[in-house]
């Protein structure tokens, strides 16, 4: 792979006026996601059995069993957007303390905040098959 695609001359990313969640909106919407949508866990991990209290509560809220609740992540949610251009927009939002150790960042299109792929909330919906 010794050939690279050339970027169009003058491409400097997105204009600042391109509409996207602001840092202030993100902070507010994150707090709403935690309080009203059970967004978590606070310290995500891939360790089986970790964060039991969180996943038992999520399972009850989502009317599924704990095992199914653990399979749900922002990264496999219908509303998770981590496309290239969204990543460019996300770079405008500084990393928050809660972003560290929580996986990659994406944009939750339903709750309009920067979420992390290792977390989940009650708004989670199964992603539609891309084969459809």
Where are these regions (language model features)?
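Cysteine-centered metal-binding/redox modules
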Residues: 2-132
